[in-house]
């Protein structure tokens, strides 16, 4: 459950290390975002010399969340941290590598490039 003011780790090599959620996209009064949802965020911590700067407003897709997610088959999935991948306006990831596992829900939301770059899909 990612909401406004939630801080997330960035799971790619775009240069950002931590982001803070500004808005959850997908409806006027939408409060929470889960795996596969898009958020608008600001970069809170970045690597010096990277193409993403601190204070920059970016879009990101959630790839891991601490809150357990119930799947259609009745199983639950949860991760140790909240993490996101920065995306371009076209929906492609800004980085060229993804770190850590990602949720299978990304496949249903058509983020095939993120799925193919990820080392593990759970």
Swiss-Prot record:
InterPro entries: Ribosomal_uL14 (IPR000218), Ribosomal_uL14_bac-type (IPR005745), Ribosomal_uL14_CS (IPR019972), Ribosomal_uL14_sf (IPR036853). Coiled coil: none annotated. GO terms for biological process: translation. PROSITE patterns: RIBOSOMAL_L14 (PS00049). GO terms for molecular function: large ribosomal subunit rRNA binding; structural constituent of ribosome. Keywords: Ribonucleoprotein, Ribosomal protein, RNA-binding, rRNA-binding. It holds the Pfam family Ribosomal_L14. Signal peptide: none annotated. SMART domains: Ribosomal_L14. SUPFAM superfamilies: Ribosomal protein L14. One of its GO terms (cellular component) is cytosolic large ribosomal subunit. It comes from the Bacteria. Belongs to the universal ribosomal protein uL14 family. NCBIfam families: rplN_bact (TIGR01067). Part of the 50S ribosomal subunit. Forms a cluster with proteins L3 and L19. In the 70S ribosome, L14 and L19 interact and together make contacts with the 16S rRNA in bridges B5 and B8. Binds to 23S rRNA. Forms part of two intersubunit bridges in the 70S ribosome. This is Large ribosomal subunit protein uL14. It comes from Saccharopolyspora erythraea (strain ATCC 11635 / DSM 40517 / JCM 4748 / NBRC 13426 / NCIMB 8594 / NRRL 2338). The gene is rplN.
């Amino acid at each position: 459950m990612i909401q406004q003011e939630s801080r997330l780790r960035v799971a790619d090599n775009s240069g950002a290390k931590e982001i803070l959620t500004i808005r959850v996209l997908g409806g006027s009064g939408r409060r929470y975002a889960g795996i596969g949802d898009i958020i608008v965020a600001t970069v809170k911590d970045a690597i010096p010399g990277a193409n993403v700067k601190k204070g920059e407003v970016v879009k990101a897709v959630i790839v891991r969340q601490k809150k357990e997610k119930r799947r259609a088959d009745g199983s639950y999935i949860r991760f140790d941290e909240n993490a996101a991948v920065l995306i371009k306006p076209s929906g492609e990831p800004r980085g060229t590598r993804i770190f850590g596992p990602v949720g299978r829900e990304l496949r249903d939301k058509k983020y095939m490039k993120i799925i193919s770059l990820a080392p593990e899909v759970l």
